[in-house]
């Protein structure tokens, strides 16, 4: 029975699975974003966050622990010098998983796993202010364009240059709208 056993098997032997995780963590910390399947991304998240936590400790023992799992010494150096200091004030949640859809060949659900890049020093009230700005922005934009239209004098348009004609895409006409226009 499989009681109290953490992690997914992913249809691989233990050695293959561990090697795959080590390769994925090395690539993830090197590129800071990779595309993989949903299940692999969820498993990778826990390992990567443990590595970043080791990087935040910053001592020699933590560096050796990370080096025993990560395959490339340059990536270990990057983890301790560039990645971990970014998350010094963050208590966890260093990664984000974004679902992409399905892979055409085998219908596997794909995701992008990436490091979170937002600033923690922003005041907590900014989210509400941004939502208010988003609600009022369309109204203000509509009023501004209406004011511009009223203020601009009517000028007859000259023939457009040949470059402008080529640069403009052809108008797409919906057949349903065309039938309605003929019926009127």
UniProtKB/Swiss-Prot annotation:
Top-level taxon: Bacteria
UniProt xrefs under InterPro entries: Ribosomal_bL17, Ribosomal_bL17_CS, Ribosomal_bL17_sf
Alphabetical list of Pfam families matching this protein: Ribosomal_L17
UniProt keyword annotation of Manganese present: no
Alphabetic keyword roster: Ribonucleoprotein, Ribosomal protein
GO MF annotation: an example: structural constituent of ribosome
GO cellular-component term (any): cytosolic large ribosomal subunit
PROSITE patterns in the record: RIBOSOMAL_L17
SUPFAM superfamilies associated with the record: Prokaryotic ribosomal protein L17
Keyword Ribonucleoprotein carried by entry: yes
One GO process term, biological-process aspect: translation
NCBIfam families, A to Z: L17
Quaternary state and interactors: Part of the 50S ribosomal subunit. Contacts protein L32.
Family: Belongs to the bacterial ribosomal protein bL17 family.
Name this protein carries in UniProt: Large ribosomal subunit protein bL17
């Amino acid at each position: 029975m499989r009681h109290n056993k953490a992690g997914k098997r992913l249809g691989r032997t233990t050695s293959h699975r561990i090697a795959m995780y080590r390769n994925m963590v090395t690539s993830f910390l090197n590129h800071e974003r990779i595309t993989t399947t949903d299940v692999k991304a969820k498993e990778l998240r826990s390992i990567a966050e443990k590595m970043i936590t080791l990087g935040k400790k910053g001592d020699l023992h933590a560096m050796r622990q990370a080096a025993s799992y990560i395959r490339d010494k340059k990536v270990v150096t990057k983890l301790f010098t560039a990645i971990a200091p970014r998350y010094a004030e963050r208590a966890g949640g260093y990664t984000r998983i974004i679902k992409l859809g399905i892979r055409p060949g085998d219908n596997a659900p794909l995701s992008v796993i990436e490091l979170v890049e937002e600033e923690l020093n922003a005041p907590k009230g900014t989210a509400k202010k941004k939502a208010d700005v988003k609600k009022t922005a369309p109204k203000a934009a509509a009023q501004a364009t209406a004011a511009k239209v009223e203020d601009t004098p009517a000028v007859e348009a000259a023939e457009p240059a040949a470059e402008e004609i080529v640069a403009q895409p052809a108008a797409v006409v919906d057949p349903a709208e065309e039938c309605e226009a003929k019926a009127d």
